Amino acid sequence: MSIMGISYGGEVAIQFAVKNPDKVRRLILANTCARTSDWLRKIGDGWNAVAKTGSGEAYYLTTIPVIYSTAFYEREAAWMEKREGVLIPYFSRPDVQESLIRLTDSSRDYDYTDRVHEITCPTLIISCSEDCLVPPTEQVILHQKIKGSAYVTINGSGHASMYEDPASFTALVLGFTNLSDDGIKI
């Protein structure tokens, strides 16, 4: 099977690929990392502190704007306003706040830095030049540790590349997933 993971989903995909190498044909890791750095842990602590206030608006304002590039956020102001109208009520629900805290806490001690080299399947690592949540340096670490991995940067995009540049993101994912096991032949 081919597996793709974005951000936290990439962490899950890494763990699955390491533990089940015989089940993964191709792996795509987008805007993710091999470990939760101290810096990222502090960001998560901040998100949890805001979630504990019960304010969906405060949670939205703390977590959502930073996942987009500044250019996208400003260019797509109307779209962002619609997202805000949907997400603030959602983030205001106590059950959602509890689940967001559990999600953040579940990656607190995540560290596969010493195991990602065990990934042997063809792997595509997608980075984004404007990702300030999981910066490109984290994907470079993955690329250096996963032998034979391919590395690509989506320029101008932030952490939410699937929204910011869906054409590039989709082309990369589908192109890599559907690539012949024999590679590219001309």
Give names to the regions the model predicted.
Residues M1-S7:
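Alpha/beta-hydrolase fold nucleophile elbow
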Residues S7-G10, N20:
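Active-site loop->helix "elbow" adjoining a glycine-rich segment at hydrolase catalytic centers
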Residues I14, V18-K19, R25-S55:
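Flexible "cap/lid" loop of the alpha/beta hydrolase fold
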Residues D38-L40, A58-R115:
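Conserved alpha/beta-hydrolase catalytic His-Asp/Glu region
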Residues Y112, C121, P135-Q144:
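Short alpha-helix in the alpha/beta-hydrolase fold that links the catalytic acid
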Residues I119, I125-S127, D131:
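Short beta-strand/loop motif that positions the catalytic acidic residue
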Residues S149-I186:
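Catalytic active-site module of serine/aspartate enzymes centered on a nucleophile-bearing elbow/loop
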